[in-house]
Amino acid sequence: METPMNMTEQAATKDPAREQFYRRIDQYNLTPLWEVLGTLVPNNPRPKQVPALWRYADVREHVMESGTLITAEEAVRRVLILENPALRGNSSITQSLYAGLQMIMPGEVAPAHRHTQTALRLVLDGEGAYTAVNGERTTMHRGDFIITPAWTWHDHGNLGDQPVVWLDGLDIPLVRFFDTGFHEHSDHAVQDTARPEGDALARYGSNLLPVDFQQQASEPTKIFVYPYAQTRAALTAIAAGAPADPHLGHKMRYVNPATGASPMPTMGAYAQLLPAGFQTAPYRCTDGTVYVCLEGAGSAQIGDQTFQFAPNDVFVVPSWHTLTLNADSETVLFSFSDRPVQQALGMWREEKH
């Protein structure tokens, strides 16, 4: 009994009449679907990005050197982009996400601007800097998760005596895909302060809301800082009261307390504690995910590759790649991905082994 030829065999068997037909229709900007169907509609995800890790101990010196070459004012944002090795030149760490290491020197200001891209910050190194969002400042402490929602005025400054470094995460590739990017510079490098520090957290993040406040699940949170001290205390309490999930350890998602949805409509953020000696069972999901080690050390087996990580190291797990985490000591990981978009579109999947 004859069996149908697979795509490779079909490609190797060139039909002269078909090839001539393809050349004729090419001038009309036409192409035959049957020649590319397997690529367009794969049986499983085939991400272009690859697993990768950036050791902070290796890249920190380059981040610091950038501070001697260009000012924050001239650069607008002094950032070294973490480019996926398979996506070089695209300013992308996954197909839909951007990540970079931003540094601000003592006395500098990264001037106020706004854009349609949503941004998150995870503070890694140094003290004394602040971020201002729509008229309110927050002092940046290591591990703090800070949001600048789409189209909000924001600037950064360093009032301390040491450089401060944080991880930037943005949905730049997603906005680029939709061709919806807008950007404006403010007339003032430093925006005026309209509210005292901590106002948004008190107003929207204390199990209370203004009596007439209403918000849709698709809108970003009014809270723009999630202090690491609170996150760490919650993880510690949770780990003391319940066994770790076999696949995830003690993993929590950041939420907009007014809606229970993701703080950002296009990116989800997560905090994860792994007990010392803990190894997760193999797990994979469709959202390519960027991880940052905040505490501890261990290894990440991503597909058939294994990466050792330490504090401030960044690693990326591509879509549908099996992940196993090993914690040498008690470890805290921060991560972010495009899961909210996939879930809203009904595309997200996970698989636990």
Residue ranges with predicted function:
Residues 2-94, 191-266, 270:
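A short, N-terminal "cap"/entry segment at the start of jelly-roll beta-barrel domains
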Residues 87-98, 105-119, 135, 259-268, ...:
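A short beta-loop-beta micro-motif enriched in histidine and acidic residues
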Residues 102, 272, 315:
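Conserved GNAT-family N-acetyltransferase fold
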Residues 260, 267-273, 283-286, 296, ...:
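C-terminal structured domain segments across diverse proteins
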